UniProtKB/Swiss-Prot annotation:
GO terms for molecular function: DNA-binding transcription factor activity; transcription cis-regulatory region binding. It comes from the Eukaryota. CDD domains: AP2. Its main location: nucleus. This is Ethylene-responsive transcription factor ERF056. Gene3D superfamilies: AP2/ERF domain.
């Protein structure tokens, strides 16, 4: 068998001349082979270091991304726990209800708090489960909710009392206006009003005829005074003389006489 041979330049220090001598693979020592392999691996590592490093992104399962905003008053912490909060109706601040292992438990806690604050008007995540037995809220949260409900009831009572006082003031003003009406209109019953209206509707003609008779009697009894237009006034007016002014019209007779002469 023929063995492959490689030629490596071997320096000749004695004469100062480089000579290429044939060197076979079988003549390499194990140390030289190991050194060559290390050089090749080093080149591969330098080439791989030049490329950008791959960063593994955080795996987001579709369940977490969907349930993040699925329930009302529930949000997720970055470490995975679920938090329930509710907005108070008056000052619009958030009341913390606690942290829970699942989103459903947090949603049920929100439903309990919302039902205590708003009653049947509340918008719930699970309206069918509100009357069933649920896990109670923490004691601190429950006491806060009860105090808030009491304050809301007090404000509602104050508002209702103020509305009643307004209505009473309106009624009192209407009663005072009735005092200015005549007594006959205040104390007459409805039947008398109807009878008086019927009588007034039945006898309008008799009243009109009586008024005409009275006016005719007054006219006949009173002295008749007429304007006296005598002729003396017209005679006095006719006695005044008017000044004679020269006529503006052309005298054609005088012009014809002058032309003939």
């Amino acid at each position: 068998m023929e063995t492959a041979s490689l030629s490596f330049p071997v320096p000749n220090t004695s004469f100062g001349v480089n000579k290429s001598m044939p060197l076979g693979l079988n003549q390499l020592t194990p140390y030289q082979i190991h050194q060559i392999q290390n050089q090749l691996n080093h080149r591969r590592s330098t080439i791989s270091n030049l490329s950008p490093n791959r960063i593994r992104m955080k795996n987001l399962t579709p369940s977490t991304s969907k349930t993040k905003n699925l329930y009302r008053g529930v949000r997720q912490r970055h470490w995975g726990k679920w938090v329930a909060e509710i907005r108070l109706p008056k000052n619009r601040t958030r009341l913390w209800l606690g942290t829970f292992e699942t989103a459903e438990k947090a949603a049920l806690a929100y439903d309990q708090a919302a039902f205590q604050l708003r009653g049947d008007i509340a918008k719930l995540n699970f309206p069918n489960l509100i009357h069933e037995d649920m896990n109670p809220l923490p004691s601190s949260v429950d006491t806060k909710l009860q105090a808030i409900c009491k304050s809301l009831r007090k404000t509602e009572e104050i508002c209702s009392v103020s509305d009643q006082t307004k209505e009473y003031s309106v009624y009192s003003v209407s009663d005072k206006t009735e005092l200015f009406l005549p007594k006959a209109e205040l104390f007459l019953p409805k039947r008398e009003h109807l009878e008086t209206n019927e009588l007034s509707n039945e006898s309008p003609r008799s009243d009109e005829t009586s008024l005409l008779d009275e006016s005719q009697a007054e006219y006949s009894s009173s002295d008749k005074t007429f304007l006296d237009f005598s002729d003396t006034e017209f005679e006095e007016i006719g006695s005044f003389g008017l000044r004679k002014f020269p006529s503006v019209e052309i005298d054609w007779d005088a012009i014809s006489k002058l032309a003939n002469s």
